[in-house]
């Protein structure tokens, strides 16, 4: 329990204590982050690394008008279990598409995560895609945070390259189709 009397998540690692919610006013950083995001378009993908401070997800889900897609990657099964005991997801999931990916659960490795994300990211929504790594997660789960960030970056780059390739070759493919159509009739 923090100074304000609210339940918070704190984790000890390497003899250091990490507060995932903050000692004071745990709602304030999430509220400010949500304001900075502004209005989100319909189906905007929002990637969140970690649910140790569920207030970011809560702020996003409760204060976004359009239906968006929220992809949450949690590197700790224990933190995810605590999260499930703390919040009521039903109203958030009625309003938005929320995908939880928890490292350590069966079938939830990074390769399968990549396949899932590939189905969500499109060239059209790349410009409005948002990312958040919950504060202190980069210290607690450094390697996972780097892997998550690289994966998202690589998938975005791949989508841009694929789009540019389609644009470049679409004219050539149309010309080839028309030029070779006469052979199809033979």
List each model region and its residues.
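N-terminal donor/sugar-recognition subdomains of glycan-related enzymes
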Residues: 1-186
């Amino acid at each position: 329990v923090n100074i304000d009397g609210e339940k918070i998540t704190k984790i000890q690692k390497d003899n250091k204590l990490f507060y995932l919610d903050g000692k004071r006013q745990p709602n304030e950083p999430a509220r400010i982050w949500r304001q900075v995001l502004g209005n989100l378009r319909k189906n905007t993908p929002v990637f969140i690394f970690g649910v140790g401070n569920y207030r970011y997800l809560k702020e996003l889900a409760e204060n976004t008008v359009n239906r968006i897609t929220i992809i949450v990657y949690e590197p700790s099964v224990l933190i995810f279990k605590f999260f499930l005991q703390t919040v009521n997801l039903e109203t958030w999931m009625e309003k938005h598409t929320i995908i939880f990916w928890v490292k350590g659960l069966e079938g939830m490795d990074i390769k399968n995560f990549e396949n899932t994300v590939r189905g969500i990211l499109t060239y059209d929504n790349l410009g409005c895609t948002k990312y958040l790594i919950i504060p202190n997660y980069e210290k607690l789960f450094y390697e996972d945070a780097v892997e998550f960030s690289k994966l998202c970056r690589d998938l975005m780059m791949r989508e841009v390259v694929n789009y540019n390739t389609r644009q470049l070759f679409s004219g050539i493919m149309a010309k080839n189709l028309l030029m070779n159509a006469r052979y199809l009739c033979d």
